[in-house]
């Protein structure tokens, strides 16, 4: 164990494989310094689908845009299984790194690789077998069906690359390195945009070209980050003595990963159900929502991944037993999130129409109006989703991932129930779907903060 600890600490002193401890130093600057590369990286990650949406919407038309936009929602739901497993494993890595137990960290790396690798394979098989029933369940219109099916077949053929990138990104962030994932993602984003233009404009491959561009870019980021991480961080290399499926390690990884996976899956299943309701309103609403939700996701992405950085901060300090530092960190995170969300809310409300015009030609007035309405309703309440991301990260980090699932069920349950109820009322329609989303956010916030005040504020020992 001592050798493992010295290896990483020596790398820190040499500055080659830089990691960042969040258990000492100024809390505000430490959290922001660690969060910025994560925020930039995940803003860049949005370009994977935004590049497809922008180019497809401009050059292939509304039907292709509706196909790619709806496919994105399904992709997020299905890949949330992998992302949840990676995030759950990352919490365990952070706790063990905070406690400086590097032998346990290596065992966890092996167990999580086996668990997530097998899950990736099973998910791939499931998509190829059940893609048609899934699309039928989503009520995908006939004019969009084949385009969406072709896009998804290609995307999920490369899902292993998505696993590689997110796994090693989670591992690196757990030990305090949020820069390397950003570097490899930036390369992939540039490649994705270039290949989009080549495959769609030069080769005429249509929606399939957009899918291939994304898969190739993900392959570069996933394989590249994997090999570079193993090269630069010897402690990530697993030896034969670490290849032990000890029950305690398996249980810890499986518990965190499965609950985080459940949270991500519930979250995206709810979104998928709302997408099915939106699809029933026709191609114009689908296209308007597809463009607007990209802008929406891009706008609140910084607070989503600030929440992940906050979770790493909490986990490292929880592992190190620094509970008072955790309480101070909570106050800092709440203030930072509120300030950022207020700024973004004003910008999105004012710039909603110009932002829609980036994706949709000016003559498509109905689609633009639908998107503007969505953005102005959601954008006014970003602080609700910002605080919810903090709650998710907090409860994962203090060994209560089940509470994150409860909050997700509340948020998404309210959203789905209200959306279907209000949309059926004459004169409300799609407007009711838009309003159901922030209402779900705030009800989950209230429950999560009340639970913290009753239980967690008194003691961080569960």
Question: Language-model segments: which ranges?
Answer:
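Transmembrane helical elements of multi-pass membrane transporters/channels
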Residues: 32-52, 154, 165, 188, ...
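Short runs within selected transmembrane alpha-helices of multi-pass transporters and secretion channels
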Residues: 86, 154-173, 181-189, 210-225, ...
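Short alpha-helical transmembrane segments in multi-pass integral membrane proteins
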Residues: 2-35, 93-158, 202-258, 314-381, ...
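Small-residue hotspots at the loop-to-helix junctions and early N-terminal turns
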Residues: 62-73, 152, 211, 283-298, ...
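N-terminal transmembrane alpha-helices
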Residues: 22-60, 73-88, 92, 117-124, ...
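Helix-terminus/linker motif at the lipid-water interface of multi-pass membrane proteins
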Residues: 47-66, 135-142, 198-205, 265-294, ...
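Hydrophobic transmembrane alpha-helices of multi-pass small-molecule transporters
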Residues: 77-80, 192-196, 222-226, 298-301, ...
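Small-residue-rich hydrophobic transmembrane alpha-helices
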Residues: 65-125, 162-181, 288-352, 385-399, ...
């Amino acid at each position: 164990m001592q050798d493992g600890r010295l290896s990483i600490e020596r790398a820190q002193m040499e500055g080659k494989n830089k990691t960042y401890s969040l258990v000492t130093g100024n809390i505000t600057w430490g959290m922001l310094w660690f969060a910025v590369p994560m925020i930039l990286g995940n803003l860049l990650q949005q370009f994977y689908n935004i590049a497809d949406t922008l180019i497809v919407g401009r050059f292939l038309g509304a039907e292709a845009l509706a196909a790619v936009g709806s496919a994105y929602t399904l992709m997020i739901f299905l890949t949330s299984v992998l992302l949840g497993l990676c995030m759950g494993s990352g919490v365990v890595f952070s706790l063990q790194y905070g406690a400086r137990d590097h032998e346990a960290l290596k065992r966890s790396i092996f167990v999580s690789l086996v668990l997530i690798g097998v899950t990736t394979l099973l998910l791939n098989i499931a998509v190829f077998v059940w893609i048609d029933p899934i699309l039928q369940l989503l009520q995908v219109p006939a004019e969009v069906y084949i385009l969406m099916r072709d896009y998804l077949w290609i995307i999920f053929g490369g899902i292993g690359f998505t696993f590689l990138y997110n796994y090693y990104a989670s591992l690196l962030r757990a030990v305090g390195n949020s820069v390397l994932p950003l570097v490899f993602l930036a390369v992939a984003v540039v490649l994705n945009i270039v290949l989009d233009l080549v495959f769609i404009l030069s080769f005429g491959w249509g929606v399939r070209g957009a899918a291939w561009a994304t898969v190739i870019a993900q392959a570069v980021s996933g394989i590249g980050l994997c090999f570079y991480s193993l090269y630069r961080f010897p402690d990530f290399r697993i030896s034969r003595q670490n290849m032990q499926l000890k029950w305690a390690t398996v249980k810890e990884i499986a518990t965190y990963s499965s609950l985080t996976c459940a949270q991500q899956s519930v979250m995206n299943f709810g979104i998928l159900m709302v997408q099915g309701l939106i699809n029933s309103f026709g191609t114009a609403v689908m296209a308007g929502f597809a463009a607007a939700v990209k802008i929406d996701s891009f706008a609140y992405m910084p607070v989503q991944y600030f929440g992940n950085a906050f979770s790493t901060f909490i986990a490292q300090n929880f592992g190190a037993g620094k509970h008072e530092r955790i309480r101070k960190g909570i106050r800092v995170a709440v203030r930072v999130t509120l300030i950022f969300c207020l700024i973004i809310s004003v910008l999105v409300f004012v710039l909603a129409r110009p932002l829609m015009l980036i994706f949709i030609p000016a003559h498509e007035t109905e689609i633009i109006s639908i998107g503007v309405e969505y953005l102005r309703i959601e954008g006014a309440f970003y602080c609700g989703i910002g605080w919810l991301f903090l709650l998710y990260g907090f409860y994962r980090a203090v060994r209560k991932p089940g509470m994150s699932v409860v909050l997700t069920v509340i948020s998404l349950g309210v959203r789905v129930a209200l959306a279907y109820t209000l949309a059926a009322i004459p004169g409300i329609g799609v407007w009711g779907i838009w309003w159901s989303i922030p209402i779900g956010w705030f009800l989950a916030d209230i429950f999560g903060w009340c639970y913290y005040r009753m239980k967690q504020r008194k003691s961080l020992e569960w």
